[in-house]
Swiss-Prot record:
Mg(2+) 2 binds at E67. It comes from the Bacteria. Homodimer which binds Holliday junction (HJ) DNA. The HJ becomes 2-fold symmetrical on binding to RuvC with unstacked arms; it has a different conformation from HJ DNA in complex with RuvA. In the full resolvosome a probable DNA-RuvA(4)-RuvB(12)-RuvC(2) complex forms which resolves the HJ. The RuvA-RuvB-RuvC complex processes Holliday junction (HJ) DNA during genetic recombination and DNA repair. Endonuclease that resolves HJ intermediates. Cleaves cruciform DNA by making single-stranded nicks across the HJ at symmetrical positions within the homologous arms, yielding a 5'-phosphate and a 3'-hydroxyl group; requires a central core of homology in the junction. The consensus cleavage sequence is 5'-(A/T)TT(C/G)-3'. Cleavage occurs on the 3'-side of the TT dinucleotide at the point of strand exchange. Its EC number is 3.1.21.10. This is Crossover junction endodeoxyribonuclease RuvC. GO terms for cellular component: cytoplasm; Holliday junction resolvase complex. It comes from Actinobacillus pleuropneumoniae serotype 5b (strain L20). Belongs to the RuvC family. Its main location: cytoplasm. It catalyses: Endonucleolytic cleavage at a junction such as a reciprocal single-stranded crossover between two homologous DNA duplexes (Holliday junction).
Length: 192
C-alpha cells in the first residue's frame, strides 16, 4: 500500500497530490498548491523546498513522482522550471524518497487516453478516477495525474513480474526493488 506524492513543479505555483495505492484501488489523501509570491527566485525556491518538506512530513509518502522538464520556447522560463524541479527533488531525496520522473505527454496519455489532453480534460479524469466530489485546482490535478501515472506504472510492473513468474508481493520494499529493476533495464528514469 504505497503512498505516492506527485509534484507538478513551477517557480510560482507548484502543485502536489498524494494518493495511496492498494492493488488497483487508488485513494485520494490530499492535494493543493505551494504558491510563491513575486519575490526573488532564491526566496521562491526556499518556499518550494519548505512546502514540499511540509507535505512529506504530513503524509509520509513512500515514493515521489515528478514531471520531467520539457523544452520551453522561453529559455529563462525553462531554467526557472528546472530550478523549481531540482528544489522539489532535493527535498524528496533529503527524506530518502525514491524519485521517479514522467513526461507530461505520458501523464496525459495515462490519465485521459490522449497525450495532448488539455488541463480541463486532466482535471475531469482525475476527479473521476479518484471519485472526488469536486474538481481539484489545475496544478493539483496535474500533480495527482503524475501520482496516478506512477501508480499505474507500479501496477503494470507487478503484472509483468507475475507473468514472468517473479515472486513479488504487495510489500513496499519489494515493489520498490521491482521498480529499480525496471529502471536498470532502461525503461524508467529513477533518481535516488
Amino acid at each position: 500500500m504505497p503512498i505516492i506524492l506527485g509534484i507538478d513543479p513551477g517557480s510560482r505555483v507548484t502543485g502536489y497530490g498524494v494518493i495511496r495505492q492498494t492493488g488497483r484501488h487508488l485513494e485520494y489523501l490530499g492535494s493543493g498548491a505551494i504558491r510563491t509570491s513575486v519575490d526573488d527566485l532564491p526566496t521562491r525556491l526556499k518556499r518550494i523546498y519548505a512546502g514540499v518538506t511540509e507535505i512529506i512530513t504530513q503524509f509520509h509518502p513512500d515514493m515521489f513522482a515528478i514531471e520531467q522538464v520539457f523544452m520551453a520556447k522561453n529559455a529563462d522560463s525553462a531554467l526557472k522550471l528546472g530550478q523549481a524541479r531540482g528544489t522539489a527533488i532535493v527535498a524528496a531525496v533529503n527524506h530518502d524518497l525514491p524519485v521517479f520522473e514522467y513526461a507530461a505527454r505520458l501523464v496525459k496519455q495515462t490519465v485521459t487516453g490522449i497525450g495532448s489532453a488539455d488541463k480541463i480534460q486532466v482535471q475531469d479524469m482525475v476527479t473521476r478516477m479518484l471519485q472526488l466530489s469536486s474538481k481539484p485546482q489545475a496544478d493539483a490535478a496535474d500533480a495527482l495525474a503524475i501520482a496516478i501515472t506512477h501508480a499505474h506504472s507500479i501496477q503494470h510492473s507487478l503484472i509483468v513480474a507475475k507473468q514472468s513468474d517473479q515472486k513479488v508481493g504487495s510489500d513496499k520494499e519489494q515493489i520498490l526493488a521491482l521498480m529499480k529493476t525496471r529502471y536498470s533495464r532502461g525503461r524508467f528514469r529513477l533518481k535516488g
